[in-house]
């Protein structure tokens, strides 16, 4: 939602969720409910994974419009991001789409269980993307120790948006040095994992 409000030049947004209420509240006009229930995943990645598998046809339709590159952004550690992002990434890559994951790892105050679940999610999504950027939220707290909880989450959202915008606008905006999609594809294809932990 934050990324959509910030806007990225020439990028189309789709919000996916297992929670129909969260989808209805989203400002993003193109929405995809994963699974039929619409009740959320209850912090259970397995439930979200099943919901995404139920929605493969809808995922294919969403991606089958000439899409050449997809950014899959997700907060790791909860249910939907952790469980569904790897399924969406897998399908995008199967379709020959350059697939970039940008994910966050939770703050320490969110608890060790959530962090462990997030790390499992990062490992799983890394199997299905060409490149994966991992943003360590706790590092933001180390750099900005005076942040309150709300500001810390806002900073994490901003960092995720900046990462996506930076990569997307290399292609979509004209600058002094112009790179096209093939240039970026050459760099990112099967590029592995990068850790983004400094924030700004």
Predicted features along the sequence, with ranges:
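Tubulin/FtsZ superfamily GTPase core signature
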Residues: 1-200
């Amino acid at each position: 939602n934050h990324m959509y409000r910030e806007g990225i030049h020439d990028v189309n947004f789709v919000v996916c969720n297992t929670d129909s209420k969260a989808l209805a509240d989203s400002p993003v006009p193109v929405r995809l409910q994963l699974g039929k229930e619409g009740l959320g995943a209850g912090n259970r990645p397995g439930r979200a994974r099943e919901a995404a598998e139920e929605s493969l046809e809808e995922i294919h339709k969403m991606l089958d419009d000439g899409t050449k590159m997809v950014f899959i952004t997700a907060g790791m550690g909860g249910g939907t991001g952790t469980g569904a992002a790897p399924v969406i990434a897998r399908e995008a890559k199967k379709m020959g789409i350059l697939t970039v994951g940008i994910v966050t790892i939770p703050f320490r105050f969110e608890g060790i269980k959530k962090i462990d679940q997030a790390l499992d999610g990062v490992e799983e999504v890394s199997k299905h993307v060409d490149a994966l950027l991992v943003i360590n939220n706790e590092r933001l707290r180390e750099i900005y120790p005076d942040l309150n909880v709300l500001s810390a989450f806002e900073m994490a959202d901003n960092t995720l948006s900046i990462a996506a915008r930076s990569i997307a606008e290399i292609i979509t905006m004209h600058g002094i040095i112009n790179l096209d999609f093939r240039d970026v594809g050459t760099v990112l294809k099967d590029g592995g994992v990068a850790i983004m932990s400094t924030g700004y």
